[in-house]
Swiss-Prot record:
Signal peptide, first to last residue: none
Catalyzed reactions: all-trans-octaprenyl diphosphate + 4-hydroxybenzoate = 4-hydroxy-3-(all-trans-octaprenyl)benzoate + diphosphate
GO MF: 4-hydroxybenzoate polyprenyltransferase activity
Functional description taken from the UniProt entry: Catalyzes the prenylation of para-hydroxybenzoate (PHB) with an all-trans polyprenyl group. Mediates the second step in the final reaction sequence of ubiquinone-8 (UQ-8) biosynthesis, which is the condensation of the polyisoprenoid side chain with PHB, generating the first membrane-bound Q intermediate 3-octaprenyl-4-hydroxybenzoate.
Pathway: Cofactor biosynthesis; ubiquinone biosynthesis
Biological process according to GO: ubiquinone biosynthetic process
Domain of life: Bacteria
Annotated InterPro entries: HB_polyprenyltransferase-like, Prenyltransferase, UbiA_prenyltransferase, UbiA_prenylTrfase_CS, UbiA_sf
Cofactor(s) named in the record: Mg(2+)
Topology relative to the membrane: Multi-pass membrane protein
Protein name, per record: 4-hydroxybenzoate octaprenyltransferase
Location within or outside the cell: Cell inner membrane
Species for this entry: Pseudomonas paraeruginosa (strain DSM 24068 / PA7)
EC number from the UniProt entry: 2.5.1.39
Length: 296
């Protein structure tokens, strides 16, 4: 449905769709995976429905920063993407968009995001610098470490910290449980994603947890997902959440079980579907959180 809504953008200018693809608006899964944990945290930090201003800031901010992350990722990978079946048609890899145009796009997106952050408070503004730094660092880690997914996890979890400071003006220690849970979850689902490209990555020297885990990949992913649920349950206890929140965790656990079963043969397409499926786990936890506060 999201792609259907943005399709008319292709008619605005002959090159409009190239930029849509550059910022991955045609593939909104990254927005969802970044948005749900941020929304969990906004609701928990607010003790219910957050301020409308903060809700709008974070929804727009997530969308803009995910887009900026895609641009810097494609810049970093522009010499590799042409050798990977899944990424060879990306606009920077094909030359449809120049490096200069990509940098201009990245700068505009970050500037717009920072403009939104300026509407919050000082602690959130200071945290935003870390968000940009970690998001910019991630794409280059694939050259040097088998743990780029951990850096991605930190980038995808930074909104959790900012949500608390925006709502409360401070960062409670218990927020780090949510942060760590989301880092582990991100490593898990992005390992499924990396499994789809594992053979190509081995040929061109790109590192990932999928390569590091080897034949133990599914076992380790399942363990990471289990730890994610445990940490979320601990966070739920610390923030005095109730049955609806834990029901959301049960639904997420069912999603994780389906992913483990569906990838039993390690088929690349099945691994990609498992990656996409994590959106439903995040949504279930969000709905459980919302329901828990709404029914009090």
């Amino acid at each position: 449905m999201f792609v259907t809504l943005i399709k008319p953008l292709a008619r605005l200018h002959p090159r409009a769709w190239d930029f849509v693809q550059l910022v991955r608006l045609d593939r909104p899964i990254g927005i969802y995976l970044l948005l749900w944990p941020t929304l969990w945290s906004l609701w928990i930090a607010a003790g219910g429905v957050p301020e409308l201003k903060n809700l709008l800031i974070f929804v727009l901010g997530v969308t803009l920063m995910r887009a900026a992350g895609c641009v810097i990722n494609d810049f970093a990978d522009r010499d590799f993407d042409g050798h990977v079946a899944r990424t060879k048609a990306r606009p920077l890899a094909t030359g449809k968009i120049s490096v200069r145009e990509a940098w201009i796009t990245f700068t505009i997106l970050v500037a717009l995001s920072f403009g939104l952050v300026l509407l919050t408070n000082a602690p959130t503004i200071w945290l935003s610098f870390g968000a940009v730094a970690v998001a910019s660092l991630y794409p280059f880690m694939k050259r040097y470490t088998y743990y780029p997914q951990v850096v991605l996890g930190a980038a995808y979890s930074w909104g959790i910290l900012m949500a608390f400071t925006a709502e409360r003006g401070e960062l409670p220690a218990s927020a780090w449980l949510l942060f760590l849970a989301n880092v582990l979850w991100t490593v898990a689902y992005d390992s499924y994603y990396a499994m789809t490209d594992r053979e190509d990555d081995l040929k061109i020297g790109i590192k990932s947890t999928a390569i590091l885990f080897g034949d133990a990949d599914r076992l380790i992913i399942g363990s990471l997902q289990g730890l994610t649920l445990l940490l979320l349950a601990l966070a739920g206890n610390r923030f005095e959440l109730g049955a609806c929140f834990y029901l959301g965790l049960v639904v997420a656990a069912a999603c994780f079980a389906w992913e483990a079963w569906s990838t039993r043969d390690r088929d690349p397409q099945a691994c990609f579907r498992a990656f996409l499926h994590n959106h439903w786990a995040g949504l279930a936890i969000f709905l459980g959180t919302v329901a828990d506060y709404a029914l009090r």
